[in-house]
Amino acid sequence: MTATFAPPANAPRVTLHLGALDGWLALSEDERYELPLGLQTLVHARFKDRMPDALALEQGIEEVEDAIMPASAWLPRPVRLVTRDALLLDIARVAAAPEVLTREAVEQLFERLARQAERAGPPDALLPQQPAWAAALLVLRECMHHWQVEQIQLESV
C-alpha cells in the first residue's frame, strides 16, 4: 500500500463535474475550464451503451486522455480536487470511502473493471453494472492519474 498525501489546507480548491454531455473544472464561478467530454457520449460512442469490453475500455482511455490532458496545465499545484457528482459519490460508496476517495482506491476499482472487461462470465458482484458508472470510473481514474491528484474530496449533494 502506498502513502497518500493530502494537499495543504491552503491549496486552491477545484471542483470537478462530469456531466452527461460535458464536464468542467472550476476554481470559482468565474473561472472554469471546460472538459470536452461527456459520460453519456463516452457510453454511447465507445461502450455501445453497455458495460465495456477490453477494446471499448482501451478506446475510452484514449478518448479521455485526449480530452483531459490539456487541463493539466490549467490546474494549480498543489490542488484540492472536490466533487458533488452523484456517480463519483457512488464510486466512493463502492470503495467504502465516505469523505475522501484516494487514487489507490480508484485504481483498485478500475482493476476490477478491467478484469471484468477481459473475460466472459458473470460480472464482478462489487461493481454496479451500469455503463455510465463504468465511464465515470474510467474518467476519474484518468483524471487523477494524469493530473497527479492523490485524492478527491467528496461533498454530499
Q: Where are the predicted features?
A:
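Helical "lid/coupling" subdomains associated with nucleotide-phosphate turnover
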Residues: 2-11, 27-157
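Short glycine-aspartate micro-motif
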Residues: 13-17
